[in-house]
UniProtKB/Swiss-Prot annotation:
Enzyme class: hydrolase
Residues annotated for ATP binding in this entry: 7-14, 98-105
UniProt catalytic activity: a ribonucleoside 5'-triphosphate + H2O = a ribonucleoside 5'-diphosphate + phosphate + H(+)
Keyword Nucleotide-binding: yes
InterPro entries listed in its UniProt record: AAA+_ATPase (IPR003593), Nuc-triphosphatase_THEP1 (IPR004948), P-loop_NTPase (IPR027417)
Function comment: Has nucleotide phosphatase activity towards ATP, GTP, CTP, TTP and UTP. May hydrolyze nucleoside diphosphates with lower efficiency.
Protein name (database record): Nucleoside-triphosphatase THEP1
One Pfam family, short name: NTPase_1
Length: 172
């Protein structure tokens, strides 16, 4: 089963993905994939990092600066992103009970290797929890269960998705 979560920036998509990954892991299941976090300096967002859920390895996804490829004010570090994300997704396909991808978005789409890995995940029978950039919702909504996260519903969405995933994994 695939679960896709979207919402406005800062609503809690990454927090939801991390909380669900932690809870599923606590139940004794293997969780793999990636989480993307903001990098902040002096209270300002200066970039993004990617973290492998199974190893904790960190790579840089984007930073404020000069260079290419760009997305808005950010330079995308395709090599830094791929160094962590591609092996993490490959390992998750081989051995995880749940794959988490945070986020499917325009920055990640600058990587052809990520697009290939995402395609393999979507073709697999693995359970997937993915956060999706709001501009890409229409592309992924038909592929699984879809949730629009808001401050008002985020606790209910967390409980619903967690309950569904735990139920699916316990059926195995």
């Amino acid at each position: 089963m695939r679960f896709f979560v979207s919402g406005m920036p800062g609503v809690g998509k990454t927090t939801l993905a991390k909380r669900i990954a932690d809870e599923v892991r606590r139940e004794g299941f293997k969780v793999g994939g990636i989480i993307t976090e903001e990098i902040r300096e002096g209270g300002k967002r200066t970039g993004f990092r990617v973290i492998a859920l199974d190893t904790g390895e960190i790579g840089r996804l984007a930073y404020v600066g000069y260079g290419y490829p760009r997305l808005g004010k950010y330079v995308i570090d395709v090599e830094g992103f791929e160094r962590v994300a591609i092996p993490a997704l490959s390992r998750a396909l081989r051995g995880a009970d749940l794959i988490v991808i945070d986020e499917i978005g325009p920055m990640e789409f600058k990587s052809n290797e990520f697009l290939k890995a995402l395609g393999l995940v979507l073709k697999s029978e693995k359970h997937l929890l993915a956060t999706v950039h709001r501009r890409l919702v229409d592309r992924y909504r038909p592929l699984g269960e879809y949730y629009w996260l808001t401050p008002e519903n985020r606790n209910a969405v967390f409980s619903e998705i967690l309950g569904r995933i735990k139920g699916l994994l316990k059926e195995k």
